[in-house]
């Protein structure tokens, strides 16, 4: 997953980036605005325009490693714990739905070699099948990965929103350490033989295969 990607894979990820991240962050923004928080609207995030959502460092990391980030500003004081949980779950659900929808054209392209070769082929330019497959895989991966209940992922905000208030207060003490937790999750834990990110990736791959093959 973290090996040096081929050029065709980078190009395919770039195309995915223009879809998966705006879908995810746009869903957060739309739901937050719907629940009464004008912060995303004032920041110009009520949009599917990729340029309004992408973070340059997160985008570059996604192109190289398949994991990146973007950000939608919201005001927790306007949303409350329950509202934050609803806003948080919107992003992953939007990605899972997008991945499932892309599985339909992916199935037809990957089962028809003539369609697969319409766009490009080889190690330089991705084939149409490559693009469709990555659209499914990385939307599913982004959806599942963000459901991990650790800060700063969406799953953590969902967890904080559904547990009893005293538990939520205790959990929220972890928020300042979100970056350190992510570094440990992605880079340190795998050195011990425990690789949650790898498990999520394998689950995403299996689910994507079933979606594409099962149509």
Question: Across the structure, where does each feature detected by a protein language model lie?
Answer:
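Hydrophobic transmembrane alpha-helices and their immediate loop junctions
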Residues: 1-215
